[in-house]
Amino acid sequence: LSHPFELSFEKKHDVAVGNGYGMTETTALISRAPLEQPPGSVGMRIPYSEIRIVHLDGLEVTQDCPLGESGVILVRGPQVFQGYKSEADNALAWVEDGWFNTGDLGYTDADGYLYISGRAKDLIIRGGHNIDPGLIEEPLNAHPDVVVSTAIGLPDSYTGELPMAYVVKTVGSNISEDELIAHCRSAMSERAAVPKRIEFIEAMPLTAVGKIFRPTLRQRITETVIKELLLEHHIDAQVSSELEKQRGLVLNISGCESDKVSSLKQLVEGFTFTIEIS
């Protein structure tokens, strides 16, 4: 829950909101915040549970992160489930000594408050519905006009994310976005996973070892979505972003006319990533 949206909800409905963090595998809660909490925090660990922020190499913990440094969130406690039915899923879910890998990124402060900064796993989460990017990439990569595709979450102020994909086309191809979406719709059984948008790109951003670097794609589409939103509402401002070590993706909006700042804040308050307006 973004802090601006939290404040807006409290003001509109005259009711206090406490932020929290959890997932199905933890029987709802991992942490919850008292009504007085630092902005952006999802609270402290619930009683009898443990939270650990680490760097991972596969399933091996290489380092416990110091305060303020972002890493993978591990959780252990009586609220954590016993495991998945599928052994294949279990093999990737557990780290040493019963620690469950949430797949989320976050950090803690000196007072024990937890902050979410991103996601380590590539899942697209559409209003609580988990979508495996592979469901989208498999039919796209099988198309003769596609060299490679990468599915990521399209920022959405209502559902959090919608499925989308970046695609590198074959040389000379004139395939359109609508045609590829129609191809996915006919090839995919999971309706909620059909991409809502496809962006064409000359080449995928790669890591030093040649793997597709999804954070750059997320950064790119986030800027695009916000720029389109501002254009639609006739707000003239500059949009930029950066990937911070602690907070993850941070979007910056600057140069907005003073009489439109209030409208701008209302427009972007539903997004879950950090937005700074100057």
Spans of model-derived segments:
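Active-site/pore-lining binding-face segments in mid-to-C-terminal subdomains
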Residues: 198, 204, 213-218
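AMP-binding/adenylate-forming catalytic core of the ANL superfamily
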Residues: 77, 82-83, 92, 97, ...
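Generic structural signal for coil/turn-prone sequence and helix-edge features
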Residues: 269, 273-278
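Short, internal active-site loops enriched in acidic
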Residues: 156, 202-206
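Glycine-centered tight turns that cap/initiate beta-strands
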Residues: 14, 48, 89, 145-148, ...
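Conserved AMP-binding/adenylate-forming
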Residues: 3-20, 24-114, 121-123, 136-137, ...
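Solvent-exposed beta-strand sheet faces enriched in polar/charged residues
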Residues: 20, 54, 117, 152, ...
